[in-house]
């Protein structure tokens, strides 16, 4: 149900329900069903939904966006204090800031540091589906992050915590303190899972790119599947 699934209006033999769960300042499971379109200045010919924001309890904002043919943002996203990360889930997109330009395809990503606005446009005949992340940058000493672009298909998986059934690939330098956050892909073989329930200060956003499974949030198990979004808050407020 909802615009993402092209299933709107009156539905026969259907009772209003949702798998989505919202626990402000704790966690959220947001499914594609029920997402509504938002109108945001600068986004032209785009269907956009806000997944998380400071109103939910996050220090960042995540958007899921369908960029239609000739869709674009030429006003620029971000400002002198905001960093931007864009990930292409489907389709292709031209993405650039003031010092780098990249033609991205599915799996492509672009990190734009604070002080550089990010721009994009869809020059293809097909829709592009993207995840967009925006956050206020917290500088450390005189360290300065650089623009980074790439594609996850060119990054090899590594064993996650020495397990042979869970794998990870980092999209940003994990040990460079110029970068105050990271994006990574986790891949689980069938039946695999984390070795323990994580309890830590870091907050997370997570987008399920494929498959389905179970996720434990505040000691409650939830079924999750492709295109679901999860927000996990910091354990201290």
Question: What is each model feature region?
Answer:
Residues 94-96, 102, 120-122, 189, ...:
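Long compositionally biased, domain-poor regions of proteins
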Residues 37-76, 158-197, 202-203:
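A short glycine-rich, His/Asp/Glu-containing loop-to-beta-strand
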Residues 69, 80-98, 201-219:
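Glycine- and acidic-residue-biased ligand/ion/polar-headgroup-sensing regions
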Residues 46, 56-58, 100-101, 114-140, ...:
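Ligand-binding loop in jelly-roll beta-barrel domains
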Residues 2-61:
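An N-terminus-focused feature that recognizes amino-terminal "leader" regions
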Residues 2-8, 123-166:
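Double-stranded beta-helix
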Residues 85, 98-115, 218-235:
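Short acidic-glycine-tyrosine-enriched beta hairpin
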């Amino acid at each position: 149900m909802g615009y993402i699934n092209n299933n709107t209006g009156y539905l026969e033999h259907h009772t209003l329900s949702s798998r989505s769960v919202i626990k402000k300042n704790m966690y959220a499971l947001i499914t594609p069903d029920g997402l509504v379109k938002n109108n945001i200045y600068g986004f032209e010919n785009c269907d956009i939904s806000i997944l998380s924001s400071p109103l939910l309890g996050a220090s960042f904002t995540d958007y899921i966006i369908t960029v239609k043919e000739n869709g674009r943002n030429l006003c620029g996203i971000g400002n002198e204090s905001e960093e931007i990360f864009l990930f292409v889930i489907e389709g292709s997109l031209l993405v650039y800031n003031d010092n780098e330009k990249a033609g991205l395809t599915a799996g492509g990503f672009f990190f734009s540091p604070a002080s550089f606005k990010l721009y994009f446009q869809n020059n293809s005949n097909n829709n592009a589906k993207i995840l967009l992340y925006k956050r206020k940058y917290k500088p450390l000493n005189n360290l300065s992050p650089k623009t980074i672009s790439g594609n996850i298909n060119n990054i090899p998986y590594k064993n996650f915590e020495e397990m042979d059934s869970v794998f990870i690939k980092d999209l940003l330098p994990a040990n460079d303190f110029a970068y105050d956050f990271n994006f990574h892909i986790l891949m689980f073989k069938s039946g695999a899972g984390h070795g323990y329930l994580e309890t830590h200060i870091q907050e997370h956003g997570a987008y399920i790119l494929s498959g389905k499974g179970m996720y434990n949030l505040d000691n409650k198990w939830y079924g999750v599947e492709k295109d679901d979004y999860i927000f996990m808050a910091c354990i201290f407020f």
